[in-house]
Amino acid sequence: DVSFTVEDGEMLVITGPNGGGKSTLAKLLMGINEATGGKIILDGQDITSYTIDKRAQAGMGFAFQQPPRFKGMTVKRLLSLAAGRELDDTTCCELLSSVGLCAKEYINREADATLSGGEMKRIEIATVLAKDHKICVFDEPEAGIDLWSFSMLIKRFEQIHKEKKQSLILISHQERIIRMADRIMVIGDGKVEAVGTADEIVPILFGKKPESCGCRIQKGGELYER
């Protein structure tokens, strides 16, 4: 059982060992999996039974761990659909550039299997950024992204957090993402093991021995078990 609240404008990072329940939680939040109990409340509204589309309409944005592909749809069209309005080339280029893509090469390409997993991941993140959602959920946004693009993505998250005051939930093993958080929630065995600030939680994650904590942290390009 997991129970937590995300405040307006808060950045919450969820981390923990593989198989601990992070992605399952993300799928529940996104509406991919159906909850067997409890409720999901957004601005006082019970959205537990909402479909993915209806949750998006209610103000929730998602970036999945495995981005869907859209044969026959251009990247520009995909961004416009995500924004809920027709976007011009300049706006599309700005969105794509903010996630580390050379924009002019992508806006008229199809968002399909001709793009790599890392490219699709960044395009999907750009679709979330195309609209001012009440809350955005990013499931392992660093997956498949090169270090240069990841640095740009970090700056983008920091900018959103500072300027737009959107609530952000990031599920990640990446230390740089973990350290950005207002709060960190550690999940293991389907339960909340710890909640606190980066100053409180990061030393615990790095300080415990592997046998006493299952936490898996990514530092730079390498993975560390803690």
Regions found by a protein language model. Name each.
Residues 38-45, 91:
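Conserved ABC transporter NBD signature motif
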Residues 128-129:
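ABC ATPase C-loop
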